[in-house]
């Protein structure tokens, strides 16, 4: 009967032409050009282990980049945990870019948590709590487990209904699921709670999934490559049909931070019994504080997993920019946090010289108490010269896909050398808009000159403010 219906449908479709519909192309994703989009790494020579003058989007600051590469190597060898580094130098000398390049050199496997010192201060959460959260975000845990799973291509997915005694109609009593591999197939009778997870992941016949035998967690791997020739508007990942038996032992590796474990255990849900269940309980972080007692219990469990070989600790990097904004209470807390057994590498950055320590009143180098300075490895950065600024501007114009006339680019480089590099970088986008307004794609001298007159730099703004202060006020 079904075959007859299919033939009838195919017959009618051949006699009538389907209407032609225009397929609209998917909108091109706009890639945002950030301040350090051109930085791709530290630019270190693999043979000499020294930084190239110009490499990986970086120009100059070779000694600082070489020192940062040594810190990266120490982090990889896990002999840097609990130590701190300070990147100190004038404004616009590449301090944040060096920290970003360090994270790119470390890769995705090592946690990298950026934090601005002003983010520590909040009316809802204590300063020490914000620092502790950041510390635990920067400490990763790689969990390795061998689990009993059912894996294969879905060939049957049938929920079985049964009458409800409460008179509310029919409910799903169990789920019949058939999985197929290259070696054989198996039919499973599953709990109805698993059906909800299957619906959420939109599992259908032809998908490759695996189900953990202990916890019942369902994971959709992808679409079986047998259906790769089918026309589908949605881009899907095609995977080969699993080999071996349907029921097998599988090694599962999951990366999670200590902060994720804190949040997952603050309001535990689901079944207990193994690490993956704890990882699966991750939810949206709350603004309330996690108790020290809970953290100590999690640390005990983590230490047990590490000793038994189930998990591996991955100390990451916590980058705190504008560290001079921290007060003496934060620094006092950092003394103890850096000495704890579970501590990441902390990288500070500041552009201040000798300034007042907040909450203390005394002046100190970089606004950091002397007790903390003794614990730091300090990496200095130097001011860029005119040639460095010119090459940095070349990298930025290439990243932003902007074309300059040679004389206009000379003027922009001169502005960067005389005023500031950041001011010159900020003039690129307005100059392009001025050129486009005049119907040109190439930026000329008049475009750069117009932008310098429309937008003041820091020095001109300060000079104008001082002149206004000296002018006598008109009495009413």
From Swiss-Prot:
Disruption phenotype: RNAi-mediated knockdown results in arrest at larval stage L3, with less than 40% forming a mature vulva, lipid accumulation, epidermal granule formation and reduced protein synthesis. There is also gonadal detachment during gonad migration.
GO biological process, one term: nematode larval development
Pfam families to which the protein is assigned, alphabetical: TIP49 (PF06068), TIP49_C (PF17856)
Key words of the record: ATP-binding, Chromatin regulator, Cytoplasm, DNA damage, DNA repair, Helicase, Hydrolase, Nucleotide-binding, Nucleus, Transcription, Transcription regulation
Principal localisation: cytoplasm
Molecular function per GO: ATP binding; ATP hydrolysis activity; DNA helicase activity
Binding, ATP: 89-96
Catalytic activities: ATP + H2O = ADP + phosphate + H(+)
Tissue expression notes: Expressed in gonadal cells.
Disulfide bonds: none
Region (Disordered): 1-23
Enzyme Commission number: 3.6.4.12
Source superkingdom: Eukaryota
Protein location: Cytoplasm; Nucleus
A cellular component annotation (GO) from this entry: cytoplasm
InterPro entries, per database record: AAA+_ATPase, P-loop_NTPase, RuvB-like, RuvB-like_C, RuvBL1/2_DNA/RNA_bd_dom, TIP49_P-loop
Function comment: Possesses single-stranded DNA-stimulated ATPase and ATP dependent DNA helicase (3' to 5') activity suggesting a role in nuclear processes such as recombination and transcription. May participate in several chromatin remodeling complexes that mediate the ATP-dependent exchange of histones and remodel chromatin by shifting nucleosomes. Involvement in these complexes is likely required for transcriptional activation of selected genes and DNA repair in response to DNA damage.
Family of the protein in this entry: Belongs to the RuvB family.
Subunit (UniProt): Forms homohexameric rings. May form a dodecamer with ruvb-2 made of two stacked hexameric rings.
Protein name (Swiss-Prot/TrEMBL): RuvB-like 1
């Amino acid at each position: 009967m079904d075959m007859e219906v299919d033939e009838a449908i195919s017959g009618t479709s051949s006699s009538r032409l389907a209407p032609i519909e225009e397929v609209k192309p998917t909108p091109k994703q706009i890639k945002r050009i950030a301040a350090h989009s051109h930085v791709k790494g530290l630019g270190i020579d693999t043979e000499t282990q020294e930084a190239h003058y110009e490499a990986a989007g970086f120009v100059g600051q070779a000694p600082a980049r070489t020192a940062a590469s040594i810190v990266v190597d120490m982090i990889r060898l896990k002999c840097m945990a609990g130590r701190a580094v300070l990147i100190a130098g004038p404004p616009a000398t590449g301090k944040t870019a060096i920290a970003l390049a360090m994270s790119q050199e470390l890769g995705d496997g090592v946690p990298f948590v950026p934090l601005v010192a002003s983010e520590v201060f909040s009316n809802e959460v204590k300063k020490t709590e914000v620092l502790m959260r950041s510390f635990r975000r920067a400490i990763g845990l790689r969990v390795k487990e061998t689990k009993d799973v059912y894996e294969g291509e879905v060939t049957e997915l049938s929920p079985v209904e049964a009458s409800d005694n409460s008179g509310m109609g029919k409910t799903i009593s169990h789920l019949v699921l058939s999985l197929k591999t290259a070696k054989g197939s198996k039919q499973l009778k599953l709990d109805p709670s698993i059906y909800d997870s299957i619906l959420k992941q939109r599992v259908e016949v032809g998908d490759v999934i695996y189900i953990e035998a202990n916890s019942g967690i369902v994971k959709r791997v992808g679409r079986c490559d047998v259906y790769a020739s089918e026309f589908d508007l949605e881009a899907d990942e095609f995977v080969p049909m699993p080999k071996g038996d349907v029921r097998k032992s599988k090694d599962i590796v999951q990366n999670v931070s200590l902060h994720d474990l804190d949040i997952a255990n603050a309001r535990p849900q689901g079944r207990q019994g193994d690490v993956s269940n704890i990882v699966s309980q991750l939810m949206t972080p709350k603004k309330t504080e996690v108790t020290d007692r809970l953290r100590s219990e999690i640390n005990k469990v983590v230490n047990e997993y590490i000793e038994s070989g189930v998990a591996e600790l991955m100390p990451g990097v916590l980058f705190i920019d504008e560290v001079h904004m921290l007060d003496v209470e934060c620094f006092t807390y950092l003394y103890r946090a850096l000495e704890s057994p579970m501590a990441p590498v902390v990288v500070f950055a500041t552009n201040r010289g000798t300034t007042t320590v907040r909450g203390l009143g005394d002046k100190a180098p970089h606004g950091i108490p002397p007790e903390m300075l003794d614990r730091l490895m300090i990496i200095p950065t130097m001011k860029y010269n005119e040639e460095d600024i010119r090459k940095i501007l070349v990298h930025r114009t290439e990243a932003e896909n902007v074309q300059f006339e040679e004389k206009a680019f000379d003027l922009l480089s001169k502005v960067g050398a005389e005023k500031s590099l950041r001011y010159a970088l900020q003039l690129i986008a307005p100059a392009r808009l001025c050129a486009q307004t005049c119907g040109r794609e190439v930026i000329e001298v008049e475009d750069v000159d117009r932008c310098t007159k429309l937008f003041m730099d820091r020095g001109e703004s300060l000079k104008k403010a001082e002149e206004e202060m000296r002018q006598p006020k008109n009495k009413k």
